[in-house]
Amino acid sequence: MCDQTFLVNVFGSCDKCFKQRALRPVFKKSQQLNYCSTCAEIMATDGLHENETLASLKSEAESLKGKLEEERAKLHDVELHQVAERVEALGQFVMKTRRTLKGHGNKVLCMDWCKDKRRIVSSSQDGKVIVWDSFTTNKEHAVTMPCTWVMACAYAPSGCAIACGGLDNKCSVYPLTFDKNENMAAKKKSVAMHTNYLSACSFTNSDMQILTASGDGTCALWDVESGQLLQSFHGHGADVLCLDLAPSETGNTFVSGGCDKKAMVWDMRSGQCVQAFETHESDVNSVRYYPSGDAFASGSDDATCRLYDLRADREVAIYSKESIIFGASSVDFSLSGRLLFAGYNDYTINVWDVLKGSRVSILFGHENRVSTLRVSPDGTAFCSGSWDHTLRVWA
């Protein structure tokens, strides 16, 4: 559509039909074009038709969306907790803080376990990334990033490298060595580059590829060695806040969540969204696959956690209580999948019975909001990070 049209005629060549005629200067996208009266009318009509087409397409999309929800509702004949009525209730549940990791000078924003079940990497608003020995609480490596708010970090499957990023819009990979005095920053490799902050990153099943999520509304798959973009994933309508790779050796799908209230499942080979779920009422802060890979959980600012069954293509459970009014910032499953651990902005960690939908425990200890939470690879413990500058290992 035109910005504005002046009805002052001049004589010359029309920029559309190239005939010598009386012209009208027309400003389109701040650029002056000279059209004859016939072409100017055609352009105005085309603009109206374009608006009508967009409106009809939007209406058709909403209609199809409604029909899809109707078809889903026909299959929604039973709830998960009804199926689980005959399942035995969980016994007494006790977990305590076994280790407290202190060393960050500001809010802990992200953490990840090494496959060796012992080491932990964490990132913070203080601009530091620290590798910890969770048994001794000693710091093994520390990297100072060029920016604050290091919002994402991940351990490589081999345990020989870490990846991190944040407000620098980049994902950087640092190799780890046995020499603790070696300058890690000198070996830094910038792998991914987004147009907005990096919110999450995760290696695939090898050290050679990494997935990233960003505030620019996209996810991307990168080659670590060359830094080449292998695949980009477009579909979220706002910042992407989290992602999780499907738990299989040939994991070719991942799930992401964002500020558009959506959780989306992607095919890494085609770059296409294969499933989308939009039942949350606020930002989706965290997503985590069920151990079998057939479902995933999400945590949101709407103070609920939800379970989605990928085979049934729908939400099957909501984990919430009237007394919980603060958002869920991070979620993860126990190794068996029976428990769902969820960190909240009210400083607590709630433990949910996945099958029955009931809360089995509430863990206190942090003095500020719980920002990140991950279960160890062997399932014997989990680690939580908080805005109180500490990480806690629970078992």
Swiss-Prot record:
- TM region(s), chain numbering: none
The record's tissue-specificity note reads:
Isoform 1 is only detected in retina. Isoform 2 is detected in brain (at protein level). Isoform 2 is detected in brain.
- Annotated InterPro entries: G-protein_beta_WD-40_rep (IPR020472), Gprotein_B (IPR001632), Guanine_nucleotide-bd_bsu (IPR016346), WD40/YVTN_repeat-like_dom_sf (IPR015943), WD40_repeat_CS (IPR019775), WD40_repeat_dom_sf (IPR036322), WD40_rpt (IPR001680)
Matching entries from Gene3D superfamilies are given as: YVTN repeat-like/Quinoprotein amine dehydrogenase
Give Gene Ontology CC terms: cell tip; cytosol; dendrite; myelin sheath; nucleus; parallel fiber to Purkinje cell synapse; photoreceptor inner segment; plasma membrane
Q: Name one GO biological process term.
A: G protein-coupled dopamine receptor signaling pathway
Which domain of life does the protein's organism represent?
Eukaryota
State its location(s): Membrane
Location (main, coarse):
membrane
Q: Which CDD domains match?
A: WD40
This entry's Gene Ontology molecular function terms read:
G-protein gamma-subunit binding; GTPase activator activity; protein-folding chaperone binding
> Which UniProt keywords are present, listed alphabetically?
Membrane, Repeat, Transducer, WD repeat
Note the segments forming the WD repeats: 103-142, 145-184, 193-234, 236-278, 279-318, 320-362, 365-394
Q: What does this protein do?
A: Enhances GTPase-activating protein (GAP) activity of regulator of G protein signaling (RGS) proteins, such as RGS7 and RGS9, hence involved in the termination of the signaling initiated by the G protein coupled receptors (GPCRs) by accelerating the GTP hydrolysis on the G-alpha subunits, thereby promoting their inactivation. Increases RGS7 GTPase-activating protein (GAP) activity, thereby regulating mood and cognition. Increases RGS9 GTPase-activating protein (GAP) activity, hence contributes to the deactivation of G protein signaling initiated by D(2) dopamine receptors.
Q: What family is it from?
A: Belongs to the WD repeat G protein beta family.
What is known about its subunit structure? Component of a complex composed of RGS9 (isoform RGS9-1), GNB5 and RGS9BP; within this complex, the presence of GNB5 stabilizes both itself and RGS9 and increases RGS9 GTPase-activating protein (GAP) activity. Interacts with RGS7, forming the RGS7-GNB5 complex; within this complex, the presence of GNB5 increases RGS7 GTPase-activating protein (GAP) activity. Interacts with GPR158; promotes the GTPase activator activity of the RGS7-GNB5 complex in absence of glycine, in contrast GTPase activator activity of the RGS7-GNB5 complex is inhibited in presence of glycine. Interacts with RGS6.
Q: What is this protein called?
A: Guanine nucleotide-binding protein subunit beta-5
Species assigned in the record: Mus musculus
